[in-house]
């Protein structure tokens, strides 16, 4: 059994969609990045890759590659799940925390959990997604960006 942790941060940018946990959330601005900038799925991907000692998201999906420009991060997470399976691992659980001031994501959490579970081919009750604000402190509090932290447990299949 192994534990992994993943952290990701993206700044907000006008004119981009806000995609979090594979869900398109109504917002006047979205997260900026080479892919769809799904901060939650990136943190989950890094946690899983780290637990399996398979590097990180930047190694597998470099932001210098045109192949990954604007790619749906659910595709990336599915690839991570298959990579773990190929290396003899299975996901036991995922626990993730989203840090952003606005918009509120409570109405979208169930869909985020389902999306992560579907990508990893696990049951939804093995995935937890929570959110908190930064109490108006720092770049998150000023609504300049968002962050996500994720931990996971994997075990040999």
Curated annotation (Swiss-Prot):
Q: How is the cofactor bound?
A: Binds 1 divalent metal cation per subunit.
Q: Does the keyword Metal-binding apply?
A: yes
Q: Which SUPFAM superfamilies match?
A: IpsF-like
Indicate the enzyme's highest-level EC class: lyase
Gene3D superfamilies reported in the protein's UniProt record: 2-C-methyl-D-erythritol 2,4-cyclodiphosphate synthase (3.30.1330.50)
According to UniProt, the reaction catalysed is: 4-CDP-2-C-methyl-D-erythritol 2-phosphate = 2-C-methyl-D-erythritol 2,4-cyclic diphosphate + CMP
The UniProt transmembrane annotation reads none
Binding annotation for a divalent metal cation: 8, 10, 42
Provide the alphabetized UniProt keywords: Isoprene biosynthesis, Lyase, Metal-binding
- GO MF terms held by the record: 2-C-methyl-D-erythritol 2,4-cyclodiphosphate synthase activity; metal ion binding
Q: What PROSITE patterns does this protein's entry cite?
A: ISPF (PS01350)
Q: Which residue numbers mark the site Transition state stabilizer? A: 34, 133
Identify the EC number(s).
4.6.1.12
Cofactor(s), by name: a divalent metal cation
Respond yes or no to whether keyword Lyase is given for this record: yes
Please list the residues that bind 4-CDP-2-C-methyl-D-erythritol 2-phosphate. 8-10, 34-35, 56-58, 132-135, 142
Please give the superkingdom of this protein's source. Bacteria
Kindly tell me the pathway this chain contributes to. Isoprenoid biosynthesis; isopentenyl diphosphate biosynthesis via DXP pathway; isopentenyl diphosphate from 1-deoxy-D-xylulose 5-phosphate: step 4/6
GO-annotated biological processes:
isopentenyl diphosphate biosynthetic process, methylerythritol 4-phosphate pathway; terpenoid biosynthetic process
**Matching PANTHER family:** 2-C-METHYL-D-ERYTHRITOL 2,4-CYCLODIPHOSPHATE SYNTHASE, CHLOROPLASTIC
What family classification does the UniProt entry report for this protein?
A: Belongs to the IspF family.
Tell me which NCBIfam families the record gives: ispF (TIGR00151)
Q: How does it assemble?
A: Homotrimer.
> What does the UniProt record say this protein does?
Involved in the biosynthesis of isopentenyl diphosphate (IPP) and dimethylallyl diphosphate (DMAPP), two major building blocks of isoprenoid compounds. Catalyzes the conversion of 4-diphosphocytidyl-2-C-methyl-D-erythritol 2-phosphate (CDP-ME2P) to 2-C-methyl-D-erythritol 2,4-cyclodiphosphate (ME-CPP) with a corresponding release of cytidine 5-monophosphate (CMP).
Q: What is this protein called?
A: 2-C-methyl-D-erythritol 2,4-cyclodiphosphate synthase
Which source organism does the UniProt entry give?
Chlorobium phaeovibrioides (strain DSM 265 / 1930)
> Lineage of the source organism?
Bacteria, Pseudomonadati, Chlorobiota, Chlorobiia, Chlorobiales
Q: Which gene encodes it?
A: ispF
